Amino acid sequence: MSGTRIEVPVDDGVLSGLDFGGQGPEVLLVHGSGHNAAVWTDVVAHLVEHCRPVAVDLRGHGQSALTSSTAEQYWRDLGAVVEALGWDRPVLVGHSTGGYAVTAAVAAGLVDAAALCVVDGMVLDDRDAATDAQAQWQNPQAAEELRETFRYGWRATEQQMFSYIEQYVREAESDWLNAGSRPELVRAVMRRSFLRGGDTLYERRPSLEEIAVVSAPDPRAPIYPSMDVYTHIRCPITFVLPARGSYAQRRDEVQTLVDAVANRHLVEISANHNVPMTRPAELAAIVGDVVRRHS
């Protein structure tokens, strides 16, 4: 299931997205850094009979030509997306950075969500620790490591792009992030991550400049990627914690976060960080349960 390409208006332009059809409760799917709307394709295949899923490419990602000039734009866009879709109290699902995006949008009052499902995208540090952690992405060495590992910002000819995509697919099964993903899904996600520019070259999204901007939020902002963001949220939250994910070693902290409020729920899953691509059926079952319980 590939979905129908759509464009969704936001304050300064449009975001690209995929409308997967279906009927029932509305579900907005938000990817993490370096991914795009196509990452949800296999999850949606198990969901679409029970709900109305739409996925968007965050600004700076996928086929959304818009880029960020402030650290908050990418999550503030979600309010405009929900309004443009004409939705009332959708379920928001976010993976990795997308998990913070949906959390921040609800915390800021931009979306009145029926529930949140946050997939390996928690924020567990206080403001001081979170500020220190964000600072690492302003380091030129960190940027170079991202460029070397993921080719973020790389500009390629069409032939170079397709050659790289096929190499990426061949190596996926031995890759720490993609092992277990369906090859055609890996190909689709990677192809969508290249945006053609006016000079006919294709840019691997996101750029390093995009990452630098979104990684420098104002520590004095009311909504910040630290654990106090959850004090602004009243709707139910389901946290999905993969056994080999980014927060596996901080399980006790996640459990404390869940135990603090009665309408929070923790679901553990045997997976690496890339849950939408490597464990789509299991994730769809979790999201489906959230939809049934809270829509």
Regions found by a protein language model. Give the residues of each.
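N-terminal cap/lid segment of alpha/beta-hydrolase-fold proteins
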Residues: 1-14
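Active-site loop/oxyanion-hole signature of alpha/beta-hydrolase fold enzymes
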Residues: 11, 54-93, 97, 107, ...
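Conserved HGGG/HGGXW glycine-rich cap/lid loop of the alpha/beta-hydrolase fold
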Residues: 14-63
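Short glycine-enriched nucleophile-adjacent loop
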Residues: 99-110, 116
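Flexible "cap/lid" loop of the alpha/beta hydrolase fold
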Residues: 114-164
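Conserved alpha/beta-hydrolase catalytic His-Asp/Glu region
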Residues: 128, 151-213
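Conserved serine/cysteine hydrolase catalytic core
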Residues: 194-259
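Catalytic histidine-centered segment of alpha/beta-hydrolase-like enzymes
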Residues: 271-280
